[in-house]
């Protein structure tokens, strides 16, 4: 997700290198502020189906016009569960993007409240003007029903889907067991 506005998906011929074959087709999808890894998978599955339907006949009839890749191919390392650990000193938008990127079907973003490991599945940027000047990063400053607001370095994040057993105002969420 990484603050990007679009995702470009390529299909290409396989070569001995990593993702460096000639490009057969390329399509893009928007990444909007409501997307998460699951909705991006949905979008990708739609365009991949379209790309294969459009290009398999061309490949079988030797009518495909390939494009040579320019520059170094890029790829991301395999994601691990530890990648989901929330660092509450980051900006609320960076934390929001992390949660969006590692939600289902991935292992999820997580934090600790004392000894309890809490998985956070959904959140939204809440506000940058409301201040809690005496609150620490990661401190729960408000609770609404089963949602809670967390103080971050530059604003507030509303946690809307989590597996915490019990939370209290003034609880401090951390990146490690305390």
Regions found by a protein language model. Give the residues of each.
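Donor/substrate-binding cores of folate-linked one-carbon enzymes
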Residues: 1-75, 81-82
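A generic secondary-structure signal marking the coil-to-beta-strand transition
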Residues: 10, 21-22, 84, 116, ...
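Short, charged low-complexity intrinsically disordered segments located at boundaries
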Residues: 28-31, 73-90, 123-133
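Generic signature of intrinsically disordered, low-complexity segments enriched in small/polar residues
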Residues: 44, 55, 78-79, 109, ...
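Active-site-lining helix/loop region of Rossmann-like oxidoreductase modules
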Residues: 57-112
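An anion-binding loop in the catalytic cleft
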Residues: 89-178
